[in-house]
């Protein structure tokens, strides 16, 4: 796998500060499971996947206008209490 560089990502966002904001928002979406990845995972962490998507031009600054979604709820197993 090729390494993702800041320069690759800066072709699709205005500056480094905006890159941090966009990558943060996208990696949170991926980590929480609220959005599906647009590229194959290749055993990457959500942060690396977010940067790969930005470098590929699949994610841009419009993601900052989206609301932050809570994590996908996992059902809790019911516990039995014995008296």
Swiss-Prot record:
State which Enzyme Commission number(s) the record gives.
2.7.7.6
| Gene Ontology biological process terms from the UniProt entry | DNA-templated transcription
Instruction: List the Gene Ontology MF annotations in alphabetical order.
Output: DNA binding; DNA-directed RNA polymerase activity
InterPro entries named in the record:
DNA-dir_RNA_pol_omega (IPR003716), Pol_omega/Rpo6/RPB6 (IPR006110), RPB6/omega-like_sf (IPR036161)
Concerning Gene3D superfamilies, the annotation shows: 3.90.940.10
Q: What class of enzyme is it?
A: transferase
Report keywords, A-Z.
DNA-directed RNA polymerase, Nucleotidyltransferase, Transcription, Transferase
Cellular-component GO terms for this entry: DNA-directed RNA polymerase complex
Question: Reaction catalysed?
Answer: RNA(n) + a ribonucleoside 5'-triphosphate = RNA(n+1) + diphosphate
Q: State the protein's purpose.
A: Promotes RNA polymerase assembly. Latches the N- and C-terminal regions of the beta' subunit thereby facilitating its interaction with the beta and alpha subunits.
State the oligomer form and interacting partners. Answer: The RNAP catalytic core consists of 2 alpha, 1 beta, 1 beta' and 1 omega subunit. When a sigma factor is associated with the core the holoenzyme is formed, which can initiate transcription.
Family, similarity comment: Belongs to the RNA polymerase subunit omega family.
Q: NCBIfam families this protein is in? A: rpoZ (TIGR00690)
**Name of the protein described by the UniProt record:** DNA-directed RNA polymerase subunit omega
Q: List the source organism.
A: Chromohalobacter salexigens (strain ATCC BAA-138 / DSM 3043 / CIP 106854 / NCIMB 13768 / 1H11)
């Amino acid at each position: 796998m090729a390494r993702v560089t800041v320069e690759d990502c800066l072709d699709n966002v205005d500056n480094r500060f905006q890159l941090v904001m966009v990558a943060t928002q996208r990696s949170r979406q991926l980590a929480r499971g609220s959005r599906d990845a647009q590229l194959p995972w290749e055993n990457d962490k959500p942060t690396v996947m977010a940067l790969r998507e930005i470098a590929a031009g699949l994610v841009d600054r419009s993601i900052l206008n989206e609301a932050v979604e809570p994590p996908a709820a996992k059902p809790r197993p019911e516990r039995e209490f014995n008296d």
